[in-house]
Amino acid sequence: MIAKTTIIISLMFCSTAMALTDKELTDVLTAIRTVESNNNPSAVGDNGNAIGVYQIWKSYWKDARQTSSIGGVYNDCFTPDYADRVVRAYMKRYATEKRLGREVTQEDIARIHNGGPNGYKKSATVKYWKKVQKVLNDR
């Protein structure tokens, strides 16, 4: 019994999993795609620096690949399924309870996507979150 309790407590405090449900994560990612590109896989923005439905920068893609085996090349970000894997890998790295010190929210996901690993703390990402939130609320 002590071993089971220790394992449960360890999982509670050491977990890096996001607290969002799969549906909540999928919903916010869908809203981000809408805000970023209106779901256009061919979208190119930010003077050619951001591509695909999520408007992924090369540095974001490289960062996501640091702790994930997603493979591929940067231009694969034009493929929505691949781009989704990139964003999920990025969030698995940065949108964690351990990093944030609390449960991860949809707002955190949106603000980290927009502002980088510490985007959830940046006032500059609040306006972006409001856009994503509007899409979520209008669904």
Named regions from a protein language model:
Residues 23-25, 47-49, 103-106:
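Extracellular/periplasmic catalytic domains that process cell-envelope and extracellular macromolecules
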Residues 58-120, 129-137:
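Alpha-helical segment that forms one wall of the substrate-binding/catalytic cleft
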Residues 41, 121-123:
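Extracytoplasmic/secreted cell-surface and envelope-processing proteins
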Residues 14-16:
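N-terminal signal peptide c-region/cleavage motif recognized by signal peptidases
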Residues 1-9:
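Sec-dependent signal peptide recognition
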Residues 31-71, 91:
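Secreted/periplasmic proteins that engage bacterial cell-wall peptidoglycan
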Residues 24-40, 56, 87, 108-117:
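Short, functionally critical alpha-helical segments immediately adjacent to catalytic or ligand/cofactor-binding
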